[in-house]
Amino acid sequence: MTFESARPDDFNEIQNLYWDLIDKSKDEPSFPDWKKGEHPSSDFLMQNIANNQLLILRDEGIIKACAIVNSISNKEYANVSWQVKEKGNNVWILHALAIRFEYRGMGLGTLLVKHILSYAKAKNIEAIHLDVIDKNTLADKLYIKAGFKYISTENIFYEVVGTREFRMYEYMI
């Protein structure tokens, strides 16, 4: 299994990974209310691929997991009492972590997060911030297990879900 940045020719496979996951898990209690074509959008995926910010786990030629890390956050992040404050490019935001549907429950989320944390350390990142939508208890468990600290619960507006409660997590590198 390799950890790497996605390439432009990975776009279709990554988009299909998200769309298949949405189709097959939308009725599950922890589903984060992603919508095909809206979140993650094609433009969002392509932009992050172009910037080497879409990270993947590839095994035997198949992308089994992916996530986005960049410094783009929702405006409400500025109101959170983070232990490490953003001052330029010292903090990454973790977005849209997804595991290919048929490979869920195999520890790939944990493996991907561990690789991201190691990569962040190598890039001299001081902290990783993220938010988890109110009902996504599976993501809460993943991030807590990986060492992220719960910071607060905030009302955040995202176009795809409206204003909802999100739990804010931080990992200090």
Where are the language model's segments positioned?
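C-terminal "cap" of GNAT-fold acetyltransferases
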Residues: 133-137, 145-146, 156-173
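Conserved acetyl-CoA-binding loop-helix of GNAT-fold acetyltransferases
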Residues: 99, 105-118, 141-145
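A short beta-loop-alpha structural element at the N-terminal edge
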Residues: 2-16
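Conserved beta-hairpin
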Residues: 51-67
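Conserved acyl-donor/pantetheine-binding loop and adjacent beta-alpha core of acyl/acetyltransferases
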Residues: 68-96, 104, 159-160
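Conserved GNAT acetyl-CoA-binding A-motif
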Residues: 113, 120-131
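Conserved GNAT-fold acetyl-CoA-binding loop/helix
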Residues: 23-43
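A short helix-loop-beta-strand connector motif used in the catalytic cores of GNAT acetyltransferases and
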Residues: 43-56, 72-76, 93
